[in-house]
C-alpha cells in the first residue's frame, strides 16, 4: 500500500531534524523548468498569481532568485500545518520512519511528488496556481501517475490510499493508474447531515499517517479500526474504494 498526502504552505526550517540518510526528489529536471518560469515573475506578478501579500511575494521572489543556494531539509520534517503536526514525526522510531519512506508520498506543486526524506528548499507553490500557460495538475499528472504505478508494482498490497486534498489528488490520472485507488473521507454528523470540517479532517489525515507508520500498515482493511477525534469507521457509508469515517 502507498499513501499520498498534500504538501503544506507552511514550512519550518528552524526546527532541527534528526540525522538520517536523505534522498533526492525524483523530478528535479521538471522542478527546474518551473523555477525558470517563477524566476521570471516580478514581485507584483507573484502576488497576483499566488494571491499573497506583497511581503510574501518579496520573500518568495528572493527564494526563487537564489534557489540553488537555499538551505535544504527532509520534506517530512519541514512541512508544517494540521496534517504534518498530527503525524508527530519527531516521535516516530527509525523503523517507522523507514516504513513511511517506502509507503508514503507527498504531492507538491513544485516537486511533483516527494518521499518523506527527500530534501526540499524553501518555496511556495500551490497546485492550483497557474504559471503562464502551465496548469500544474496537467504538468505533473503523467509523471506522478507513472511513478506511483512503478512503486505499487513492487508493493505486496497494491493499493493507493488517498489522504490528499482534491486539489492535490487530482494530479493522479485515474485512467492511467493501474491499481486500486482508495479514497479516505472524514465527515461529521451535524444535525443529521454529514459534513466535512476541514481542520478536523486534516488532523485526522495526519493521525492516520502516524498510525500507518507506527503499526507498519500496508492494507486499507487494517485501517478500519482507526479512531481519532471521535471518528469511527462507517460500514454503511463505505465501499471497496471509499473508506468513510464519521464523527457523531
Swiss-Prot record:
Superkingdom field: Bacteria
Pfam families, A to Z: H2O2_YaaD
GO biological process terms on file: response to hydroperoxide
Gene Ontology CC: cytosol
UniProt-listed InterPro entries: YaaA
Family affiliation: Belongs to the UPF0246 family.
Official protein name in the record: UPF0246 protein RC0754
Species of origin: Rickettsia conorii (strain ATCC VR-613 / Malish 7)
Amino acid at each position: 500500500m502507498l499513501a499520498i498526502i498534500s504538501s503544506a504552505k507552511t514550512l519550518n526550517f528552524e526546527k532541527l531534524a534528526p540525522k538520517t540518510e536523505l534522498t533526492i526528489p525524483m523530478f528535479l529536471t521538471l522542478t527546474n523548468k518551473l523555477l525558470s518560469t517563477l524566476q521570471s515573475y516580478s514581485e507584483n506578478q507573484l502576488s497576483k498569481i499566488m494571491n499573497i501579500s506583497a511581503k510574501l511575494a518579496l520573500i518568495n521572489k528572493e527564494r526563487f532568485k537564489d534557489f540553488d543556494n537555499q538551505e535544504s531539509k527532509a520534506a517530512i520534517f519541514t512541512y508544517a500545518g494540521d496534517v504534518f503536526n498530527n503525524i508527530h514525526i519527531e516521535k516516530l522510531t527509525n523503523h517507522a520512519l523507514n516504513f513511511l519512506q517506502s509507503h508514503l508520498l507527498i504531492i507538491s506543486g513544485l516537486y511533483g511528488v516527494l518521499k518523506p526524506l527527500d530534501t526540499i528548499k524553501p518555496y511556495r507553490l500551490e497546485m492550483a496556481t497557474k504559471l503562464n500557460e502551465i496548469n500544474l495538475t496537467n504538468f505533473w499528472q503523467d509523471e506522478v501517475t507513472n511513478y506511483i504505478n512503478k512503486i505499487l508494482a513492487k508493493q505486496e498490497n497494491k493499493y493507493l490510499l488517498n489522504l490528499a486534498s482534491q486539489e492535490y489528488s487530482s494530479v493522479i490520472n485515474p485512467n492511467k493508474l493501474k491499481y486500486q485507488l482508495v479514497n479516505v473521507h472524514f465527515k461529521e454528523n451535524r444535525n443529521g447531515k454529514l459534513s466535512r470540517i476541514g481542520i478536523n479532517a486534516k488532523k485526522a489525515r495526519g493521525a492516520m499517517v502516524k498510525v500507518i507508520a507506527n503499526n507498519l500498515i500496508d492494507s486499507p482493511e487494517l485501517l478500519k479500526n482507526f479512531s481519532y477525534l471521535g471518528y469511527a469507521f462507517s460500514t454503511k457509508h463505505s465501499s471497496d474504494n471509499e473508506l468513510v469515517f464519521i464523527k457523531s
